[in-house]
Amino acid sequence: MNKSQIIIGTASWGSRINFKESMQVSASLLELGINHFDTAPLYGSGYSHYVLNKIGKQNNILIDTKYGQNTHLNWRELFKRFYRFINFKTFKYSFKHIRFNKYVRLKKDFWDIQKLNNAYNLFSDELDKCKISTFYLHSPPKYILDYKYLQNFSKFCSTKNVVPGICDPDQENLDLLIEKFPNIKLQMPIEFFWKNREKILKSSNKIDIFRIFRKIINDRKNNQHNLQKFWHEFLNIIETNSKYKLVLGINSKNSIKKLRKIIENTNNLFNM
């Protein structure tokens, strides 16, 4: 597989693995020649932007980040921040983007272009040692994405010199996105991609696909029939379309070893 088709998911960087381990994993990935990372301000229990910017101080890295992640303060989120406590400064930083009202993102005002501008400027400051490549809206409610809004969102991203993106789009928004906005990058679960592949393959949108490892694990548990046929067909689509990329969550030495095998031969993905 071409390394340029691999993006590293960092949802666990800062939470499941600590700061030191995150730095070690990133060093190994950069040695492999992979420098494109997918994140959001609340990934890694609120530490992800902080960790990636530390990496960016000494390396040229590309970042895809997101606005609107559906996360609010609860006991679990609070515990994870205590668990990964580094110092008071970073602990305070981890609460920077947390929301106390989980329903606020359902309001149209939350997705106002001015709100996006404020968020982007804040993200840009937090990631000032990195290059932001794509600015995603994270799972926006389906009633937000009408033609006029997407036009304004595209124009806004153009002023920031970043690619506009929609992460985890609603099924009802897909036709509008692929028929009228080929400039907007889409990030979606593998199941959604496969379900809509006939439409998507006819479009010119760039697509990033996630939940790859989760599907492999679930398929094995459920003893799904024709697994190899599905995976070979899927991987053939990826290898023959450079506009499609895989978002892979890598967070350990073991997963890095597996990633090396995938780069050597894409079919090794099925054997992970």
Region annotations inferred by a language model:
Residues 62-67, 89-94, 206-215:
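Non-cysteine beta-strand/loop elements that form the S-adenosyl-L-methionine
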Residues 2-7, 102-103, 131-134, 179-181:
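A short alpha-helix capping/helix-coil boundary motif
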